[in-house]
Amino acid sequence: SRTGKQFKNLAHIELALIGFFKQNPDVILDGELYNHKLKNDFEKIISLVRKQKPTADDRLDAQHLVQFHVYDYFDGVKYDSYKTRMQQLSFNKQIYCASIKFVPARLVDSYNYARDIHAEFLDQGYEGSIIRLDGLYKHGRSYDLMKFKDFSDTEATIIGYETGKGKRQGTLGK
């Protein structure tokens, strides 16, 4: 994980990357655990990833459903531009397989082009897109990175509620 926590149900991803990291021990692959087939059930991915004592069935489900989507690369030594890091990711094709996916980037030079690409991603079922400046790698949050999402705002009238029970006591909802 980003904080160094080891996940116990992702042996298939670890196995897919072990050779790469033996040859490149200082490299950081930045990405997220995802599967676009589960875009409407992200909780399923989270549930499989967070299993502390996975069963054989849990491991099999994770192997078929959880993928690591790689979108950035840092070699631990050089501070390269994003464009150079993307080239490194595309050169290392040996790591990509059913469990490891490369997230391609496109150079955007206008707001209209960014909107067009964003519309493509929405049509494919993604919730948005990411805009990244051609800057140096930065661990954690970065001002070089911005989410591009569409939001809708609406008002509603509350017609009823339930009081919370157990750990939700004193709040609304189950």
Segments predicted by a language model, with ranges:
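Nucleic-acid 5′ end/cap handling module spanning
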Residues: S1-T3, D58-L60, H64-L65, Y73-G76, ...
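Covalent nucleotidyltransferase
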Residues: S1-A98
